[in-house]
Amino acid sequence: YIVSYFTDPEPLIHIDSVYDRTADLTIELWSMPTLLGKRYGTSKPLIILTSKDTLGIAEDVAYCLKNLKRATIVGENTAGGTVKMSKMKVGDTDFYVTVPVAKSINPITGKSWEINGVAPDVDVAAEDALDAA
C-alpha cells in the first residue's frame, strides 16, 4: 500500500477502512512494516498536487495522508469518486448501471472523501499548483 512508503515502519498505523456493501464486510488497512522499495519516511515534507480530475484511489491516498498530517494537499478539490464500482444488469433488458459497491471510511475523521472529494490545504487552480507548492 503506497501510504506505507510515507510512514515509519513502527508503530503500525490504521490508514483506512473499506466497507464492501456486497459482502457487508469492513476491511481495515494498516501500514506495512516492510516494503519492497525504499521508504520515504516521515522526516521529509510531502506535497500532493490535485485537480478536479483526481479520482478514485488517488483521492484515497491524498485523503489518508492529509488526515495523518503527513502531506499538504495543493490544487483543486478532487472529483469525489469511489474505491470500487460494479456493473449491474437492469432486469431482462440490455441496460446496465454502474454503482459504487465499496466505501472508504477514514479512521481519523470517520468520514469518506467520496461524493465531496478531498479539499486542498492550499486551494489554487490545477495549472498553478506546482508553482504554489
Identify the meaning behind each predicted range.
Residues 60, 108-113:
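Short conserved micro-motifs at the rims of enzyme active sites and ligand-binding pockets
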